């Protein structure tokens, strides 16, 4: 059944401060990472690090996600706007985060933390990789609740009508449904069955399922058995790259513009290196040691 998106992106207000569901999804993702990471720490899966040390790591990873995600969005998707108005970088409440930028930010944070602790960076990345998909899933749910990053038009029965989406897939920048009708009129037309041809793929939910649920199950089960260094990180990069590349075929390109060939999106271009890196890390893992778990120490590193 076709669904009309009518979810308020604002969860609640505290005086003049409006708390968005998207921000709450970030908090849920970090909370889940904390709980799952705590379990792995207690199992001795990050050598020489206890709960306090993991808390320190998670704090820097959170900073990397937020800062890297915002900077990445400006560089990858809104560079022209950033050049015109550099202060856009700090207006995070207006939205705009990039997974690929967040990934770079996390890797830089992990590299710094690992060096400070005199640990191999990829031992830490392998530990963290199974914790990430839950956060990705929550983030994509936040995108859906916010009615953003929608998919292309579809005739499938599970399509979603997004009032903020353009009335057509092309050309970019045209009027959205909410620009020509108020929400009461949209609801009346929806009830009369007149809006079915404006339904779109809920690509946010596709990504929540693949990048969130499926990746979590696969990585969690894969990492339960001791694996050589680089293997878990390689599987994460490979799965995300493949899933994101595939979903981009039914997701509207950023700003409605394809980068090449009339179908290749910026998200696909940014995901291709992840596939290559994933395969390379798998190759490296065949030549690397398998680290045995060691109970967490009493004192954090």
UniProtKB/Swiss-Prot annotation:
Q: Where in the cell is it found?
A: Cell inner membrane
User: What is the recorded membrane topology of this protein?
Assistant: Multi-pass membrane protein
Q: Where are the transmembrane segments?
A: 10-30, 57-77, 92-112, 119-139, 202-222, 230-250, 264-284
A Pfam family assignment: LGT
GO biological process annotation, one example: lipoprotein biosynthetic process
Q: EC number(s) in its UniProt entry? A: 2.5.1.145
Against InterPro entries, the record matches this protein to: Lgt
- PROSITE patterns in UniProt: LGT (PS01311)
Q: Where is a 1,2-diacyl-sn-glycero-3-phospho-(1'-sn-glycerol) bound in this sequence?
A: 140
Look at the named UniProt entry and state the broad enzyme category this protein falls under.
transferase
A cellular component term, taken from the record's GO annotations: plasma membrane
Q: Where is the signal peptide?
A: none
Q: Domain of life here?
A: Bacteria
Write out the pathway annotation from the protein's UniProt entry.
Answer: Protein modification; lipoprotein biosynthesis (diacylglyceryl transfer)
User: What family is this protein classified in?
Assistant: Belongs to the Lgt family.
Query: Any idea what job this protein has?
Result: Catalyzes the transfer of the diacylglyceryl group from phosphatidylglycerol to the sulfhydryl group of the N-terminal cysteine of a prolipoprotein, the first step in the formation of mature lipoproteins.
- By what name is this protein known? Phosphatidylglycerol--prolipoprotein diacylglyceryl transferase
Q: What is the lineage of its organism?
A: Bacteria, Pseudomonadati, Pseudomonadota, Gammaproteobacteria, Lysobacterales
